[in-house]
Amino acid sequence: MKQQHTLTYFISSLVILVFCVSVNAQNDSIPKTVKDTLIIKEKYGLRIGADLGKLARSFFDDEYSGFEIAADYRLKKRIYIAGEIGFDEKTTVTDYLDITSTGSYIKGGIDYNMYQNWLDMDNMVYTGFRIGASTFSQNLNSFTIYNTNQYWARQFTSNDLQEFKGLTAIWVELIIGMKVELFNNLFLGLNVQLKLMASETEPDNFGNVFIPGFNKTFDSSGIGVGYGYTLSYRIPLYKKNK
């Protein structure tokens, strides 16, 4: 009787041991959860484009022609070196003045991307600054001297062309905008600029009405505004882990 009890205990223990080994083997055969090893890489490169707004305005506005080339280079994850170079010709006509402003400009600065992209998205919502410089000329086509007492004398009007060359201007501007990747490496952008004049040379007897790159001046306040619609293509140079 005692031997039968001992045999039963031995068999039971053996069954339990085999069961435990079997369970352990099954657990070992189940693959463990693998940590996500997907590595997303971000593109770094040179982005070059044109201002579509200036091209469209040149087509529709008879008193304006101009173009602008814009570029940026991704320096760090959120920091871009950026700049623009362009040309403007604008004729301003008022009741007392007809003047054509012509010249070129260059701007350079930094953009900071505030937008956190998902996965491999590559869009921008950014803010930045520029330092701009322009060299230009003003052609005074005609002008009228306003006379408050027209009873005794008529207003004086001159149609003699006067040219003022070698004028310069330097300014700073704040910029905010966005760039959306339409297709692989092709971007559509929109931005607005607030400009503050640092220094300028003016023609004799009147102020600058329009400065290339700075745009219209407002009552000699030294404040200007601008906007841009850009289409650009990025030349990818290398990638970094996100």
Residue ranges: model-predicted function:
Residues 2-11:
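Bacterial N-terminal signal peptides that target proteins for export
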Residues 11-20:
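Bacterial N-terminal signal peptides
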Residues 25-74, 232-242:
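Short glycine/proline- and aromatic-enriched beta-strand/turn motifs that initiate or cap beta-hairpins
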Residues 34-44, 78, 116-124, 182-188, ...:
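Short loop/turn motifs that connect adjacent beta-strands in outer-membrane beta-barrel proteins
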Residues 35, 54-57, 92-98, 158-164, ...:
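Extracellular loop and loop/strand-boundary signature of outer-membrane beta-barrel proteins
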Residues 44, 63-67, 102-106, 123, ...:
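Residues that define the transmembrane beta-barrel architecture of outer-membrane proteins
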Residues 79, 84-153, 231-235:
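Gram-negative (and chloroplast) outer-membrane scaffold detector with strong preference
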Residues 130-226, 230-242:
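Outer-membrane beta-barrel transmembrane domain signature
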